[in-house]
Amino acid sequence: MSIQECPESPMLEGEEGRGVERDSDRDSAVDSASEISDGGRTGEKEEGIGICLPREKGDLMHNHFEISDQSALSSASLNEEQFEDYGEGEDGDCTTSSPCPDDEIRINGCSDLGSSVSSSAGQTPRKIHNVDDQMEVFCSQCCKRVSLLSDLENRLKNLKTSSPNRKISSTAFGRKLLHNSNISSSNGSTEDLFHDSTDSSDLDITEKVSYLDKKVTELENEILMSGDVKTKLKQENIQLVHRIHELEEQLKDQETRAEKIMEDELRRHRDAYIRLEKDKNTQIELLRNRLHQLEDENGKMAMNMNRLKSQTEKLDEEKQRMTDKLEDTSLRLKDEMDLYKKMMDKLRQNRQEFQRERDTMQELIEDLRRELEHLQLYKLEAERAGRGRRSSISLSEYSSRTRESELEQEVRRLKQDNQKLREQNEDLNGQLLSLSLHEAKNLFATQTKAQSLAMEIDHASRDQLLEALKQQEEINLRLRQYMDKIILSILDHNPSILEIKN
């Protein structure tokens, strides 16, 4: 940038005032836009506006040399429309194809300062030297700050893709421009304005540089944080999507499994119901058959009851005959029992005597055996002694023979006694048979509970009759078995008891 680049042409003082006024309006509008906007887009627009500040002044002043006040107003309105488009557009940056004032500002460089100095040189030549010195200092500082701002602009352009888009209201921006233009129109002369603009531009540039630096760092941090958050959210979203898909698959599997289970349960319950129906029908059929069978049995039982009544009457008659016989046999049994007791006492005495005799005979036999052994030894000794002792041997033989004869007689007598005891034992067995008959009589006596079974049958129920009939049959069976045993034992031991005597 240099002052020589700017065209020098005479400019009226009023036009100068209007140009500076419009420049101040533009600056105030930019400041208001920087205060309203925030985030990445606000930083970008502040950077672009801050870079365009020194150049917009030259462009506007150069335009004021060629147009009138009316054209100046129309250009201001056009600029306002451009700012409105900037506030409402989708992208906050001015591209090379758009008619943005920043393109003209970047081409013209610092022509605003040169035009302001040349315009003031025609009227106030006394101040040109001081102004040139100030401009050199100002241009060197501007170059440094502009380079710094260009770096910041490049950084913001790099961050522009990830920064959020913020829109500025066109009405608010125009209202702020109008307010700042009215305030700037009331400023002093061109010289005071120039000094104020240089001082304010230095302060504004430093403040904006620091502010933009802070904004850039904040935006970088925010972008990094937002990038991390986005990656985390993307990962979480992917995980949640996978989880949703898994849960949906599980839900489908559960639904299919539940449907299968439901079908299996329905089929199982249907089969169970059919099976229960079949079982019920079979049970009903069995119960019907059982009912018919019981009815038939009931008819048969009624017929059997009549037959059993006749049989019981016959059995009563037979029982009466048997009781008479038992009474006779009981009397005989009583006599036999008395005889049996006597015989048992006699048998006990005979057994005792037989035991005593047996003991004495055993002792006698032992004595004889000892004597016989003694005689045999004596005989052997006598044979050894010689013939001279034959007379003594004959005497001993005679005595031994006499002793043997006595023993033989005793044996015969004992055999006779044994035979007698056997006969007595047989008699006692007969008496035992008579006692068994007496026991049979007692059995009959205990089992006869009533005088007439027919009367009981008339007054008893069916169950009682059946029970009594069973008991009577058991008693008769036991009596028959007992009588058979008695007869067999009599036939084996003493059949003379069964003989019929006239």
From Swiss-Prot:
GO terms for molecular function: protein homodimerization activity; small GTPase binding. Keywords: Cell cycle, Cell division, Coiled coil, Cytoplasmic vesicle, Endosome, Membrane, Transport. This is Rab11 family-interacting protein 4B. It comes from Danio rerio (Zebrafish). It comes from the Eukaryota. It is a peripheral membrane protein. InterPro entries: FIP-RBD_C_sf, Rab-bd_FIP-RBD, Rab11-interacting_regulator. The gene is rab11fip4b. It is found in: Recycling endosome membrane; Cleavage furrow; Midbody; Cytoplasmic vesicle.
